[in-house]
């Protein structure tokens, strides 16, 4: 499966000057919503991701995703795995579990995102699940931006990665883009202003 080509064909592989959720800057951005707007394609991708997870014989009860980006991927993965799905969301900049969702003590979860960059949002969701008595057994995403180690791709962990080293991450592919702090961003130095994806229709 050529994940990069799928993103390009869907108009989801964007080039410009972007402010990522991590606060870093990048010349490229992956708009997974453009990929997941096609239900058949979303099902195909998450069916494949479910097969990868199953091949590692990871036992889990439920899937949790951080809103908003992770919801479609997480829901489709839960469907493919015949598991329950819940999501966390930000309220006043703090990740929370709302809407009557509950976590049973000892319930095993995979945290699913659309894209994993450093893994910060996924880790926030994981900490909420653990605080309620749940157990995190792994992480999953359609794609990894090259910072976190990916179990099924045998890709190494880099310094910016925030996901725990003792838990596996499963993805369909790696996109290795450079990301920059604002202070050393070459695009900023050229006078360009970073745009938060979604703020201008992207």
Curated annotation (Swiss-Prot):
Protein name, as recorded: Orotate phosphoribosyltransferase
Subunit structure: Homodimer.
Recorded family membership: Belongs to the purine/pyrimidine phosphoribosyltransferase family. PyrE subfamily.
Involved pathway(s): Pyrimidine metabolism; UMP biosynthesis via de novo pathway; UMP from orotate: step 1/2
Cited CDD domains: PRTases_typeI (cd06223)
Cofactor: Mg(2+)
Native source organism of the sequence: Campylobacter jejuni subsp. jejuni serotype O:6 (strain 81116 / NCTC 11828)
Enzyme Commission number, as recorded: 2.4.2.10
Gene: pyrE
Role: Catalyzes the transfer of a ribosyl phosphate group from 5-phosphoribose 1-diphosphate to orotate, leading to the formation of orotidine monophosphate (OMP).
Amino-acid positions noted as binding 5-phospho-alpha-D-ribose 1-diphosphate in the UniProt annotation, renumbered to this chain: 93, 113-121
Binding-site residues, orotate: 117, 145
Keyword set, alphabetical order: Glycosyltransferase, Magnesium, Pyrimidine biosynthesis, Transferase
InterPro entries: OPRT, Orotate_PRibTrfase_bac, PRibTrfase_dom, PRTase-like
Catalytic activities: orotidine 5'-phosphate + diphosphate = orotate + 5-phospho-alpha-D-ribose 1-diphosphate
């Amino acid at each position: 499966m050529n994940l990069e080509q799928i993103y390009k064909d869907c108009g989801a592989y964007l080039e410009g000057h972007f402010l990522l959720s991590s606060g870093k800057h990048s010349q490229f951005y992956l708009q997974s919503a453009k990929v997941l707007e096609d239900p058949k394609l979303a099902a195909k991708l998450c069916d494949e991701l479910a097969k990868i997870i199953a091949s590692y014989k990871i036992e889990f009860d439920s899937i949790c995703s951080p809103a908003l980006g992770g919801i479609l991927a997480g829901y489709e993965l839960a469907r493919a795995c015949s598991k329950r799905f819940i999501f966390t969301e930000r309220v006043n900049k703090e990740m929370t579990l709302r809407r009557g969702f509950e976590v049973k003590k000892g319930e095993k979860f995979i945290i699913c995102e659309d894209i994993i960059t450093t893994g910060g949002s996924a880790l926030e969701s994981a900490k909420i699940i653990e605080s309620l008595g749940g157990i995190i057994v792994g992480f999953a995403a359609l794609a990894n931006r090259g910072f976190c180690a990916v179990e099924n791709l045998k890709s190494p962990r880099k310094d910016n990665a925030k996901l725990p080293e003792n838990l596996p991450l499963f993805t369909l592919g790696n996109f290795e883009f450079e990301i920059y702090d604002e202070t050393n961003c070459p695009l900023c130095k050229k006078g360009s202003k970073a745009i938060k994806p979604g703020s201008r229709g992207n």
